[in-house]
Amino acid sequence: AIVSTDSYNYFGRDESFLDKKLLPFVKSSGYIYIAIPGMKKDCHDKLPPELLLSWTPKQLEYMHDVKYWTDMVSKCAGAEVISVNEMESNGEVWADWLKQDNEYAVGDRKSMEAGGGKYLNFISIVLRKK
């Protein structure tokens, strides 16, 4: 199995990434588990001002909704999509992240304190190699 936490959204937006770069390292019928920050609904056409308190439009290009990620991983020829869902632990995950003292978590607090959390979630993706 491969487990990816809080990183797949950076490189997984390339449609060929799963088939070419990740699946060669997974045995037949093996699993890929992905957890990434995302948006409840893509709003890149009109980014809410709350989100722009912490992130630039370019930084937000890495965050998408469940539909986007479902469409993206469904293009993979070598894996079966088991599930793509908003994580039930969304609020808890964000709260844990914001408690961290690293510069990124501290910077994210501005948006979340202004109500940006209503636009964001965490997404779980489970795939099985064919």
Language-model features: locations:
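Short conserved AdoMet
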Residues: G12, K27, S74
